[in-house]
């Protein structure tokens, strides 16, 4: 059985998840709010675990898992760094960028789950990991809206 499509889809999600992990780590460093920084560190760890789970699935399919983030993710982190420099690490700007990143990764996983060419094993692994992605998205969204309510 040719697993190349599954491996390709999974590796794309791995790169996106590693982007997210790195983004959370950088957001934790940029945050001046200890509660937010702790949330960002927790999410970085969760994303590291999701990437590890997906990498294991690629190995089980006989593939070489992606071990690094994407070029697009590096560009986004560069934009976040530039925006932080311009806004002076404004907490609202950091949280807004985190939520934007969450919208992106959630969309990537949702698109992958709609892929009719995926094997049941790959789909199952993606769906399992999506639970963490969805929860992270919802928490980031709640954080953003809570900050907006305070303003």
Please give the residue ranges for each predicted region.
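Secondary-structure edge/capping motif, primarily at the C-terminal ends of alpha-helices
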Residues: 24-31, 58-61, 86, 113-116, ...
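Carboxylate-rich helix-loop segments that flank metal/cofactor sites and access channels
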Residues: 56-106
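Alpha-helical scaffold segments that form or flank carboxylate-/histidine-based iron centers
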Residues: 6-13, 34-53, 91-97, 121-133
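Preference for long, well-ordered alpha-helical segments
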Residues: 94, 98-151
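Conserved alpha-helical segments that form or flank metal/cofactor-binding pockets of metalloenzymes
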Residues: 35-73, 140-144
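Alpha-helical bundle segments that constitute or directly flank the non-heme di-iron/ferroxidase center
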Residues: 2-31, 93-117
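Amphipathic alpha-helices that form helix-helix packing interfaces
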Residues: 13, 20, 27, 50, ...
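Charge-rich, acidic-biased intrinsically disordered regions
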Residues: 38, 45, 65-82, 122-132, ...
